[in-house]
């Protein structure tokens, strides 16, 4: 049997290396340019690499173990926190739509990446110092304590959502508009933000209990 390997000159075309497409939130906003300015919160405000998603929905995979929520994308944590008060429980589609509309409003008003505005708002809204109760039932006093980074993020998200919810109650403005205003004011550090006012109040009480 003749060996035909030498006569056949087959050249396989090398497939061009294709780069993975950049993941953009809602197909609009890049997550690679987002920067967490507070070094203590870098590990607790996940936005890049594994946390980059097209939609803020992971089907509850971050609730299986304690503290796993620290790895949950920050935009999804915002959407989850909006599902508060019994009438809103489980309405994830509604809260994702609210977040999307709020981000579009933020982009129109500021021209900045809305995810960066959210990250700045979380950094500015998390209290660095709080007070706790020390002592038995008879003699109880309050003592100032430092706040852990994860709790700072938790409280910041809760305060931002509470502020937006209370502003939208019995108001002509939609909750998406109120959430956009709250995030913009908190990112600037403005006292018009509910979250900034509450954070300053907590830190003032803690300072008096040092």
UniProtKB/Swiss-Prot annotation:
<dbReference type="InterPro" id="IPR005716">
    <property type="entry name" value="Ribosomal_uS7_euk/arc"/>
</dbReference>
<dbReference type="GO" id="GO:0006412">
    <property type="term" value="P:translation"/>
</dbReference>
<dbReference type="InterPro" id="IPR036823">
    <property type="entry name" value="Ribosomal_uS7_dom_sf"/>
</dbReference>
<keyword id="KW-0963">Cytoplasm</keyword>
<dbReference type="GO" id="GO:0042274">
    <property type="term" value="P:ribosomal small subunit biogenesis"/>
</dbReference>
<keyword id="KW-0539">Nucleus</keyword>
<dbReference type="GO" id="GO:0003735">
    <property type="term" value="F:structural constituent of ribosome"/>
</dbReference>
<comment type="function">
    <text>Component of the small ribosomal subunit. The ribosome is a large ribonucleoprotein complex responsible for the synthesis of proteins in the cell. Part of the small subunit (SSU) processome, first precursor of the small eukaryotic ribosomal subunit. During the assembly of the SSU processome in the nucleolus, many ribosome biogenesis factors, an RNA chaperone and ribosomal proteins associate with the nascent pre-rRNA and work in concert to generate RNA folding, modifications, rearrangements and cleavage as well as targeted degradation of pre-ribosomal RNA by the RNA exosome.</text>
</comment>
<dbReference type="InterPro" id="IPR023798">
    <property type="entry name" value="Ribosomal_uS7_dom"/>
</dbReference>
<comment type="subunit">
    <text>Component of the small ribosomal subunit. Part of the small subunit (SSU) processome, composed of more than 70 proteins and the RNA chaperone small nucleolar RNA (snoRNA) U3.</text>
</comment>
<dbReference type="GO" id="GO:0005840">
    <property type="term" value="C:ribosome"/>
</dbReference>
<protein>
    <recommendedName>
        <fullName>Small ribosomal subunit protein uS7</fullName>
    </recommendedName>
</protein>
<dbReference type="GO" id="GO:0032040">
    <property type="term" value="C:small-subunit processome"/>
</dbReference>
<dbReference type="GO" id="GO:0003729">
    <property type="term" value="F:mRNA binding"/>
</dbReference>
<comment type="similarity">
    <text>Belongs to the universal ribosomal protein uS7 family.</text>
</comment>
<keyword id="KW-0687">Ribonucleoprotein</keyword>
<dbReference type="Pfam" id="PF00177">
    <property type="entry name" value="Ribosomal_S7"/>
</dbReference>
<keyword id="KW-0689">Ribosomal protein</keyword>
<dbReference type="GO" id="GO:0022627">
    <property type="term" value="C:cytosolic small ribosomal subunit"/>
</dbReference>
<dbReference type="GO" id="GO:0005730">
    <property type="term" value="C:nucleolus"/>
</dbReference>
<dbReference type="GO" id="GO:0019843">
    <property type="term" value="F:rRNA binding"/>
</dbReference>
<dbReference type="InterPro" id="IPR020606">
    <property type="entry name" value="Ribosomal_uS7_CS"/>
</dbReference>
<dbReference type="InterPro" id="IPR000235">
    <property type="entry name" value="Ribosomal_uS7"/>
</dbReference>
<dbReference type="GO" id="GO:0000028">
    <property type="term" value="P:ribosomal small subunit assembly"/>
</dbReference>
